[in-house]
Amino acid sequence: DSIDMYINNRHNPKSIRYKTPQLKNILDVTYGCMVYQEQVMQIFRELAGYSFGRADVVRRAMSKKKHKVMEQEREYFVNGLKNSDGTYACDGCVRRGIPAEVANSIFDDMSSFASYAFNKSHSAAYAVIAYRTAYLKCHFPAQFTAALLTSVIDDSTKIALYIDDLARLKINVLSPSVNESF
């Protein structure tokens, strides 16, 4: 879903829709899609008035799928959290003019996304690894898959999957041989 939306929005910037205008400044660099953990934290901070620390605690709870914590935080995200002295630890979206239905929808998006998000500072390293992996698989498919097969030697399901991939590429796989194998 998110990948398709990202690609569509990248090619058709006019199709980008934000559930609330406050999301534009946060998500415009990623074509209206949540990609980075930092974006989730920024949404908590800017839409609901969370502190940096509390936003990070919620981000970690989401990534670890701590449902009880997340449901409590949903209430705070939407309606705010009042301290014992009557002040607000966080305002909540409703107090900041965002309808509860919209706030709940944004929270749902963040919850489903959070377990797949990654740290923005790591994205360049991931991109380099992905690029190099794709290059090796494209230009050296037999050698790439040989290394891949070695890495999953104990998993017959993955071995079968990779051998099928080689067959699709019309690359022959030889059986092990005591006379010829290294």
Residue spans for each PLM region:
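Noncatalytic, beta-rich nucleic-acid-contacting surfaces in large DNA/RNA-processing enzymes
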Residues: 1-182
